[in-house]
Regions:
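Active-site cores enriched in adjacent His and Asp/Glu residues with nearby glycine-rich loops
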Residues: 3, 18-36, 125, 172-214
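A composition/biophysics-driven feature that prefers long, compositionally simple stretches
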Residues: 1-171
Length: 214
């Protein structure tokens, strides 16, 4: 994980405080950035339904997604194994079943079927079908919009986050310097791009972090 468990728990506490103020017992987050912010989850798995569930009565978020992607959740998050759940493979692109039928069942199993639940209505990966599955199978839930709830909290950076951003800026500087030094008449564009990518991901001896895939 990029940050400590204490950092993630501090973020979770802030989110729960706002949830309580907005009378939300549970929120379902599908924005990959918000999933990462609260758990550390990092994976290109948003091609299928996935998300995290934050509940006032649970000490940790719940990650849900495809079974094969759950391994990534175990590697990149601080969550206990019991809080990483996955739907069966035969729920994927197999109407009339749908991954959010699994989410709906989880809501009922945890006695949230009469609670106030927030969802990110304007999140790119929260589809109309996702919402329909929830509202049709959880008719007694009071659903409300939690779009930007976490995003506004993310706006105020901790000291650890600021330090990480400063290290990231050094990577950008290294990439720009590499471009400046290698862009010349007659040099192939692909050669320069490779050099830049190497700097952005590999960094140098002065940079404490390494870049990620781009």
């Amino acid at each position: 994980m990029i940050f400590t468990k204490d950092e993630y728990l501090s973020r979770l506490s802030k989110v729960k405080k706002i949830m309580d103020q907005k009378n939300m017992d549970v929120i379902i987050l599908t924005d990959p950035s918000n999933m990462n912010y609260l758990t550390g989850y990092d994976g290109w798995s948003f091609y299928v339904p996935q998300g995290i569930i934050v509940a006032l009565d649970l000490s940790e978020p719940i990650w849900f997604g495809r079974r094969q992607d759950s391994k990534g959740a175990k590697v990149t998050t601080y969550l206990q194994d019991k809080n990483i759940i996955y739907y069966p493979e035969d729920f994927i692109q197999a109407p009339p079943t749908h991954p959010y039928d699994f989410v709906s069942s989880f809501i009922h199993e945890n006695n949230w079927a009469n609670k106030n639940i927030g969802v990110e209505m304007d999140a790119y990966y929260y589809t109309a079908e996702n919402h329909y599955r929830l509202t049709s199978t959880c008719p007694n839930v009071n659903f409300s919009d939690a779009t930007l709830l976490v995003n506004w909290i993310r706006l105020i950076k901790s000291e650890n986050e600021i330090n990480y951003m400063r290290e990231g800026a050094k990577l950008v500087e290294a990439g720009m310097m590499t471009a400046y030094e290698n862009i010349k008449p007659g040099v192939k564009q692909s050669y320069v791009a490779g050099k830049i990518q190497n700097s952005l991901i590999g960094g140098n001896e002065e940079i404490n972090i390494g870049g990620e895939y781009a």
